[in-house]
Regions:
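N-terminal export and membrane-targeting signals
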Residues: 16-35
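Hydrophobic alpha-helical transmembrane segments of multipass integral membrane proteins
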Residues: 36-39, 135
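C-terminal region of N-terminal signal peptides and the immediate post-cleavage residues
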Residues: 24, 40-62
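N-terminal capping/interface segment
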Residues: 1, 17-21, 57-63, 93
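Alpha-helical segments in soluble extracytoplasmic regions
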Residues: 59-144, 153-186
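N-terminal intrinsically disordered, acidic low-complexity segments at the extreme N-terminus
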Residues: 1-15
Length: 186
């Protein structure tokens, strides 16, 4: 096929683009919509999207009170002899009973001052305190093992593929309550 035949074929099948016509082809429309959609998304993301972490409390009143209560509990924990000072496994278990009771009292106090569970902050705090309850139960299991003569590593319950202390500590960090992290005294 020579050039003249090719030109005639284009005209006969109406395939020749008009030099002055841009045209709204489906591909162009889809492309423009995609670009506009991406631009709108990034505009929203930078200007109007919610800020902060999903676990961050809206009202800081609880976090201020909780940090104060947790700091008091940490001071009490520091008064208990360390594991290295324990004479034997029973002595270590006795130390852990004291520290676990301190933490249980702290959690009970935090629960009393927690926001209502019917609001978002209350739901978040309730889940966090439930994690504390799990951690305290793990400590009690460890105490029982020490009393039974088992000198094993302290293990905590897993949650979402990680130790229960990870979400517990993350919530405390996000809400600026560093004293409310797991103490690491075991």
């Amino acid at each position: 096929m020579d050039d003249d035949e090719f030109e005639r074929e284009l005209e006969r099948n109406n395939l020749r683009p008009d030099a002055g016509s841009w045209g709204w082809t489906p591909g162009r429309v889809i492309g423009i919509l995609l670009v506009l959609g991406m631009a709108a998304f990034w505009l929203w993301a930078f200007l109007w999207s919610p800020r902060g972490h999903p676990d961050e409390l809206d009202d800081p009143a609880f976090t201020v009170a909780a940090e104060t209560r947790c700091a008091t509990a940490l001071e009490e924990l520091r008064e208990v002899p360390s594991a290295g000072e324990a004479a034997d496994l029973n002595d270590r278990a006795d130390q852990l009973v004291i520290t676990t009771d301190i933490l249980a009292a702290m959690v009970a106090d935090l629960r009393e001052g927690a926001p209502s569970p019917t609001i978002r902050d209350g739901e978040l705090v309730s889940r966090w305190l439930d994690d504390w309850d799990t951690y305290i139960a793990d400590r009690n299991i460890y105490i029982d093992r020490l009393r039974a003569g088992e000198d094993r590593i302290f293990e905590v319950t897993a949650r979402d593929g990680d130790q229960i202390t990870s979400p517990l500590d993350l919530f405390a960090t996000i809400n600026r309550m560093p004293s409310c992290q797991a103490p690491g005294d075991v």
